[in-house]
Design a protein with these regions (language model features):
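Amphipathic alpha-helical segments used for helix-helix packing
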Residues: 28-56
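Hydrophobic/aromatic-rich alpha-helical bundle segments in the mid-to-C-terminal region
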Residues: 50-54, 65-119, 123-129
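Short alpha-helical scaffolding segments that buttress acidic/His motifs in well-ordered protein cores
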Residues: 23, 36-43, 81-85, 89
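Short linear capping/connector segments at secondary-structure termini
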Residues: 4-6, 38-42, 99
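Hydrophobic alpha-helical connector segments
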Residues: 2-36
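Amphipathic alpha-helices of TPR/Sel1-like and other helical repeat/solenoid scaffolds
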Residues: 19, 23, 60-64, 111-112
Length: 131
């Protein structure tokens, strides 16, 4: 995948920021956002569209990043990342939460990037965090 090729040169400690920058930069452009939003709407009522969206975001975006990092439970981490990204995308670009639409993209990249970084590289369970 394109992301898989690009992510090779990104230091592990910056993969969350990289993902956030790529995702927000992509969604900020109408020509990219509109087809994704259409697919999301379709996925809400059509299982085939839902499967296409799941595959698109995990195979082409989140799973290559998790595999690059080499973290445990890659499928779970990729799904969690997809949920965070899609939730953010819906909240900013479809539901238009004012706090998200009025905050500069660069600031959102930093905040979302930290969350994505945690999901990529930190222990997932409380037991793992304590050991």
């Amino acid at each position: 995948s394109q992301v898989g090729a690009q992510i090779r040169d990104v230091p592990t400690e910056h993969v969350g920021e990289y993902m956030a920058r790529l995702f927000i930069g992509h969604w900020d452009r109408d020509e990219h956002r509109n087809p994704i939003v259409s697919l999301i709407y379709a996925a809400l009522s059509d299982t085939t569209a839902a499967a296409m969206l799941r595959e698109f975001i995990t195979v082409n975006f989140t799973l290559p990043v998790v595999e690059r990092v080499g973290a445990d439970r890659p499928q779970l981490r990729a799904a969690l990342l997809a949920a965070q990204l899609l939730g953010f995308g819906l909240s900013r670009y479809v539901l238009a939460f004012d706090a998200l639409t009025s905050t500069p993209s660069a600031e959102l990249v930093a905040v979302l990037g930290a969350t994505l970084q945690h999901t990529c590289t930190s222990p997932l369970s409380a037991a793992e965090r304590q050991s």
